[in-house]
């Protein structure tokens, strides 16, 4: 998946310990990396992208991912794409989806409170008010803000962690309007993909996120000023 994943599972009464669920979540993430990594020549994603493995012979989860990606692409007017730069790569959806599923494994095992963090994109569960620091893309080492909430997901796209890596599919260039955008929602799979699409939109992102049901956003523009959608204030920590 090209990122480090960390787990926060507080030791509290009612939280299962030693049931093996954390190991299952880690094994799931390793399987996702082996199956979906575009950097591994033998992964299903790489073989499917080259045309050497038909979809029917791929892991069934790939068809699930492709269906979800098509829906998000339609909702975003094509700003979310599985072919950034012309090469098949569904990573813009897969990372959030994999982390969300890892959190679901813990929930299914009875873990009432936990968070799973993959490179700053986080799925949180439980009544605890989780606090997530968002890096300032223009001032390395500083935070732009702290996001706080319960039972929610947070995803950020921008230039802080990996530099300019998101492409506007209509221009083929890195978008210039935003330095970063943080999206908050219920489920990380969609939240992360929406953050990617919104960053690619640049100045169009604010109105688009405002129209999404159940999602809010905070952005740092490339020039420095920030903006947020109308309901984002309740997530400020």
Positions of the model-derived regions?
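Mature catalytic core of soluble alpha/beta enzymes
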Residues: 1-237
């Amino acid at each position: 998946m090209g990122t480090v994943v960390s787990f926060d599972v507080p030791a509290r009464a009612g939280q299962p310990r030693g049931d093996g669920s954390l190991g299952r979540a880690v094994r799931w993430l390793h399987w996702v990396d082996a199956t979906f990594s575009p950097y591994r020549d033998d992964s299903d994603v790489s073989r499917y992208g080259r045309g050497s493995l038909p979809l029917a012979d791929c892991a069934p989860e790939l068809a699930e991912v492709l269906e979800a990606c098509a829906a998000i692409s339609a909702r975003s007017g094509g700003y979310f794409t599985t072919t950034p730069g012309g090469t098949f790569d569904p990573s813009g959806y897969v990372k959030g989806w994999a982390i969300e599923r890892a959190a679901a494994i813990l929930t299914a095992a009875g873990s009432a409170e936990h968070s799973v963090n993959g490179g700053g994109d986080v799925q949180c569960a439980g009544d605890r008010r989780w606090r997530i620091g968002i890096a300032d893309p223009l001032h390395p080492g500083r935070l732009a803000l702290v996001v706080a909430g319960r039972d929610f997901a947070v995803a950020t796209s921008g230039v802080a962690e990996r530099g300019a890596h998101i492409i506007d599919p209509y221009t083929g260039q890195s978008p210039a309007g935003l330095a970063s955008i943080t999206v908050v929602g219920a489920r990380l799979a969609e939240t992360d993909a929406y953050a990617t699409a919104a960053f690619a939109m640049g100045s169009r992102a604010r109105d688009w996120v405002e129209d999404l049901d159940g999602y809010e956003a905070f952005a740092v523009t490339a020039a420095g000023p920030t903006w947020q959608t109308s309901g984002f204030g309740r997530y400020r920590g």
